[in-house]
Amino acid sequence: LVMGYKYFKDKRYLDSAKRTAGYLEKELISKADYFSSTLDANCEDKEASLYAATATYYLSLVTKGEEHKHYADLTKQAAYFALSWYYLWDVPFAPGQMLGDIGLKTRGWGNVSVENNHIDVFVFEFADVLRWLSNEYNESRFSNFAEVISTSMRQLLPYEGHMCGIAKVGYYPEVVQHTSWDYGKNGKGYYNDIFAPGWTVASLWELFTPGRAETFMKK
């Protein structure tokens, strides 16, 4: 909606975005109750807080004064919750488990939800949000962790001589199983055979082309 407002120069889109943000503030952010934003689970999850942080970040980019500060504060609040899903340490793997054998470090990866206990690269613009918050609030921890996310999520990019158990260059695993949570396929230390190749590439594309939204909003 915010991008629609900027592109079409139609304030109705901005008004709708602000009403949507009002709902997010009332029902999610103020309650710290972020849930049901994954397609396959109806529970608390990381994605809902990422969406809330990104939405209010967009509004912060196109507003000024007290309104800007309000949306920025909401962005920070949602981002702190989202960060609680990210690993600050490296999960150990047993010898013979593929992820351990290829040297995967889990720091900087986000868990998905209380129902789906695996890690993935669902990040999209969140690193940009963190860098922006770092500048907005003079808080280096945000940008420091954005760098951890950005470097860590490169680990499983397949290329010749570094295929990471992936059959073809250009693909990226979706369900990375770092716990003994039973998905019924392969187990800890391996990928699940559930695989959606589209969003993983789209998410990494956003991660590795920083500043796109902010550049667009400032045109």
Kindly give the residue locations of the regions a language model identified.
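Glycan-recognition and catalytic cores of secretory/periplasmic carbohydrate-active enzymes
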Residues: 1-219
